[in-house]
Amino acid sequence: MASQVSPGVVLRERDLTNATIVGASSLTAAFASSFQKGPIGEIVSISSEKQLVSVFGTPKEANAEDWMVAAEFLGYGGQLAVVRAETGCLNAGSSAGVLIKNDLEWQAGVGAANTFVARTAGSWGNSLKVVAADRGADQILTLASAPATTALGTAFTTVSGKGGRIYSFDAASNELAVILDNPGSLITSADIFDEPGDGVATSVTAGAYAGLGSQNGTHTVDPTGGSGTGLRLDVTIDAGGAVTGVAIVAGGQDYEQGDVVTCAAAGLGTGASSDLQVTISAVTNDNIAVNSVKDWYTNTEIAGTGLKLSAIGPRPGTSEYASARGLAYDEMHVAVIDTTGDVSGAANTILERFTYLSKLSDGKSSEGSLAYFKDVINQESQYIFQGASLANTIEPSSAGGGEALGSDSSALSSGDKFLLLAMNTTDLSGGTDDYAYTAGEAVAAYEFFSDTENTEVDFVLMGGSMASESDTLTKAQKVVAIAALRKDCLAFVSPHKGNQISYSGSALSSADQRANTLNFFNSITSTSYAVLDSGYKYMYDRFNDKYRYIPCNGDVAGLCVNVSTTTADWISPAGLNRGGIRNVIKLAFNPNKADRDELYQARVNPIVSFAGTGAVLFGDKTALAAPSAFDRINVRRLFLNIEKRVEALAKGVLFELNDETTRYGFLSTINSYLAEVSALQGITDYLVVCDSTNNTPEVIDRNEFVAELFIKPARSINYVTVTFTATRTGVSFSEVVGR
């Protein structure tokens, strides 16, 4: 169509190089269960057993079957998409247990009333101690005796004029931790500690007084007001009503210089018309010798851990960002400590530390990255969230005026200092476990994998059995339903544990095991998107130092991963060459030939242990009951492979023009890929139709694009017949064979 209105040349480019199909780099299995820890109701990608332990914890007695199925699959080179089921577990918090399923719930405000809370649910969080520390106190003074007042924040001075506030006092050792007004002028053992607070009045001055009436004489008065108690004065007044003298009868206690006390008029004689104001001009305080001095930060132990604050990092101070704005004392450290060893294996291990964070909500590190402590912890910590404001803050000097944590630098002025935390410790508690998920909870967890657009998986693993056969069947049917609904993956299902292993009494006979297994699988829907196996293997659980029976659905899926890695998706995973099951001491049910015949006819792939070969997957059927090319694993996986790649290419055709060029580009790319599959023994022949015969004008007018693929899949050998014929010596073989 003309696009110019005057003579000229238009150059156009058409890109047909984007029609490329890329093979899968990894195979992922969907899996859901209860765990020791980890986010709930969220799909997490796991690529190794080490990562499985790190994110979801080690297996416990109640979830070991599930956990080890997942671990065995990972051992074959697969990856997992894991969902932790929502059960009755709670996160450990600073105030009480609370359920915070995942990061999204935390961001929505769930559990934010806790100062700190374990990042995921489970009793594991009860072992956590969170330590937040800033520059804190400056020194620890060992005094000759205990001061009268040792409350947090009490102002004090030394005889030489050094001052500050009290942070803490240990009565057993007379050790007083102090925050100095001027940290550059440290207290030494030569200094004398002046009792903080108030003292005994030693000198008073009477204010102006104009009384009327006969007030002459000396009157003993107990004045009111001031910061102390117990002061008693003798006030002498002449006949004219003038105060001629004030004498201290009792100096009281806890008064401060400059206090003004009131002598009521009624106490000064008959006819007095006004009160007398008296100023305390001097007080006497007790002085205490300083026996020794040491640095607070490097000598302060984190209670109950045996660790010093210096184990977290050097003393925090003021960041470059704050200093450039004239602010001070914004830096702080946060550490998470495993007090019991339940998380790390060793008690009082520092699990993680965040150093040189900022109390400024807009704080930045020296590299320019985010430094506000709340944001850094909530975004980067593997163990905790930080919610409510930290408690027990203290003024940075006796002058007061400390700024609140979380202030923005734009709201502060040069010279401002932040309130100090010194050492703020929080022990988390209230975390609970609940490994025994119900059938409903299992179904809800697997439902996260229903969405094909947002979650790409190749397999769905059933995992272990549940408490009852009916619950196990419900779980199995859900796994199969997910795969059948998605139509882009295979479900792998094992029988109920009780079908093959007796929980009490005598062991089950082979006939009982076969009958139980067949009865269980009879209820499974016929579909080519599922694979059924007969196996429970006996293996060692290194985490709990015991042997367990574990279902083999993770192994069978793992064999598919292995065959895809070493050969191709369309090669059968069964047999002596490729079907070896790993980590097998023995099988709970080792079916003989008669058992295998019944199992295979019922869509169940036997797992067999032959002498000298170990345990082997000895069948490659899908769960499809009707005879079909899709009743074999390799054919179903062949079509899944081709369908996924054709779908990816077809998405690139969307919104293009349905013309010969587009159809040819699509056709040539599909033919190229199928030729490669054919060369690798996946198919014996194929035909792709994508031209004007099936993209008619009517199809084009409906904005449709049609392609048809005809494929002859390669078939695996399931039945071998070898005939031996004995002949007489003089007989020619051509006569016997007939050729």
Model-derived regions, located:
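Structured, hydrophobic secondary-structure cores that serve as assembly/anchoring elements
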Residues: M1-E105, N114-R119, A328-H333, D338-G341, ...
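Short, surface-exposed beta-strand/loop "edge" segments at domain boundaries and coil↔beta transitions
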Residues: T17-N18, K37-E42, L52-V53, C89-A92, ...
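Short, ordered beta-strand-loop transition motifs
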Residues: F35-K37, I100-A112, D134-Q139, Y167-E175, ...
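Structured, mid-chain assembly/scaffold modules that mediate subunit interfaces
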Residues: K60-I140, P147, R165, A177-E195, ...
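Short amphipathic beta-strand/extended segments with alternating polar/hydrophobic composition
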Residues: I100-E105, G125-A133, R165-F169, I192, ...
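Broad, structure-driven detector of short, well-ordered beta-strand segments within folded domains
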Residues: N126-D134, L231-V235, S274-V278, L307-S310, ...
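Conserved, function-critical positions that sit in or immediately flank catalytic
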Residues: L141-V290
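Beta-strand-rich solenoidal segments
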Residues: S292, T298-N378
